[in-house]
Amino acid sequence: MGLEKLLYLRGVGADFTDCFGQYICIPEADRQGILTCMLQEKNTQACEAKDEPLTSLPSGDELDAQVYQLDAHHWTQVLPAFHWCYVDEPWVCLYLPQSYRGDLLLTFTCEQGERVILEVPFSALKPIGDYRIQAEELAQFGTSPFANECQFLQYRLDLLGHEFYCRDAGDTVKQDSNAEQHNLSEPRRSWENVSAAPNGSNNKDYLSDLSCLGLGYHTLSVSLLGLADEQQGVSTASPSAASIFAASKTTEFHGTFMVAPRTAYQGGMSAVAQGKRHKPWGVSLQLYSLRSESQWGIGDFGDLEQLIGLVAEYGADFIQLNPLHALDIAAPEHPSPYSPCDRRRLNPLYIHLPSVPEFEPLKTEFAAKEWQETIALLNAENWLDYPKVSELKYRAFAHLYTVFCEHHLQPNTPRAQRFEDFVAEQGAPLREFAQAESLRSPRAIAQDEGFYLYLQFVAEDQLQLCQLKAKEAGMGIGLIRDLAVGAALQGVEVQANSQQFCLNASIGAPPDPFAPQGQNWGLTPLDPVKLKQHQYRHFIELTRANMTHCGALRIDHVMGLLRLWWWPLDKRLGHGAYVYYPVETLLAILCLESQRARCVVIGEDLGLVPPDIIHRLYQAGVYSNELFYFCKDHQGFKPPSQYKFQSLMMLANHDVPTLVAWWTGSDLHLRRQLDLLNTDEQLGEALAGRELEKHQLAQCLISQGLLAETDIQQIDIEDLLTAWMPFGASGNSALYSVQWCDLLGDRHAVNIPGTWLEYPNWQRRLPISLSEAAGRPTLAERLQRIAAARHLPETAAHTDTL
């Protein structure tokens, strides 16, 4: 029972339901292998390579001690280290010995520094749970401030509906200078509405209304007055208050108190839900794939600004981007934006060089033949050569940084001051990133830490400008950023925060008929227990960083808020298991950060989605992410009127074929060439199934009057695309997007899941430049028809479905 309880307390799942609805029991050996990954301090992969034995799982007293720490210890600490509540239902969780009957003093220190001190009678506490610790366990494993107490009660203190007294802010109790707090630079709302005290209240303020409790991360201190009064010789309601405390006489306890909203930020989406005629739409793209005359071998923020102006003219509300995360500077040949080294930082390759102020003094130098020939060669390629692009741009960055140091840092100009402010605001995490970049960068582009700080400063500046331009152009949302589900083991995000990650496992998906061996994405998972022990600091920091300079954030594999499939790095430890996370707390943090950043949240919920999370996401105002290809029922493609309202409908994305490839079947032939379809018979079956789907789609378009009735083989692909896009746009979904590559009629895949070296994933460039695209009549017609389809009659009402 002890080991099973530890597995439960560490979040290691015992079973799950697969994509066919079948109940799957996870073998005990696999579950214990994941537990070993969590508990093992050594690098298990290195142990496997050296054939070293692994540390055995805990047993006896060691096992009991670990169970005690996770199951019993918090009952002895009065106040959770991290507690949260909803803003409209503020309450405090307390753990007290059963024998304690004294009053309490609660001190709330808000983020701006204001304090509210409440004197709470014991009668206001409502018991909601109890726990008995065995005396021998307490003696052997415990660090309780209470002596000889084994029975504890959990209390709920509702902050609304009670009459508390608010002491003068000067009558503060001693503050613990070591109490951990979240470092938040921007001001937050504090508590208000403290009315005058009733007669006879001894000059105390009467706190009549706590409904204005501000959103944020506050600090809460609790003092037990029963003991404090007895120490001063005052009679208390608890006859033996002092006797229940240990010799340390600890009477004050501290924790973080988060107040969260019920839902994520909705922005203009609330008006859409109420029947607003215009429903937002936009385009999605891989930023690196854009072409222009001013880029240096890769799509950049300058190209993004140009695209914003282009699509905004047609009424687009957003541009959805691939993850912009920093990648491994030492391995530019691995360009997947979903395998970053640090999700809190931007990829400097997206910097548009001519827009950097330091570029102007260097124009003559960069106009030299050596530079221009290299730029022209890279711009002419259809596939990105990341090592060459990286070498070229980092050489140019070095020149820019030299100018910055000479023209700004040394004379301490206003631009230099903005740089210093940026570095100070970002704090230690940014400096750690710069240090890691300096150490890992190839010798040819190696620079000091200041260089990498400068690149992040410039990249953040340009991304912010793009969002400002989008809003100025009339876009309702602007940019939609993308947050990858994890980060690479050797990256600075994991290594600098290793105490919150499990370094011996990686994220993926369990085996299924489509991937019989399962999927291993090579990304390091956060450890749910360690994350909680560190008061969710990394998750807060990560979410906040990715909600800057955008109007919405798409969270890749949003099911990870509830559970993730872990693979052990050491293959001797089995075949993996699901690990569960504190989903309610993570969602509350997500909603709080969303409201603060005024950022809509979209959860990528494609694939195996557990029912447990669907309703939670819906209630939290997180938008689902649907794909046209998968939006089907037993009769074929669903009619647009049946699309989920609270969703982003995408015709296609980076993991599925482009519209042209799907219609022509070229994606299936490519899969056969790559041995993803093992036989010609499998290819034939896939092509036959695709033919049936094509007939279903054609009938949908014909029935809506978008396509003339004709033999399917006679349908012109350009006409098909022009009909298909507004068909999806006419649907019930609150948000709708089309890939930029589909608008241009490109057939090439961005990424083919299940391949690595077999196909050049994340390297395909678009066939034409932005200026060429702007002159295409077919593009203009498609954008106009999509925009028209997103404007509905006043009487039209959406159907809200999960």
What residue spans do the PLM features occupy?
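Intrinsic-disorder-associated, low-complexity terminal segments enriched in Asp/Asn/His/Tyr and depleted
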Residues: D171, D176, H182-N183, N202
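Alpha-amylase-like alpha-glycosidases and glucanotransferases acting on alpha-linked glucans and related
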Residues: G142-S144, A330-E460, G486-S737, C741-D742, ...
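Acidic/aromatic-lined carbohydrate-recognition and catalytic surfaces
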Residues: T36-E41, E52-D103, T107-R115, V120-G170, ...
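Ser/Thr/Pro-rich low-complexity tandem-repeat tracts
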Residues: N183-S185, S195, S208-S211, G233-S248
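Structured C-terminal cap/extension of enzyme domains
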Residues: G745-T795
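Long, contiguous interaction/targeting segments characteristic
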Residues: M1-T44, E48-D71
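Short acidic/polar inter-strand loop motif in beta-rich domains
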Residues: L225-E230, E252
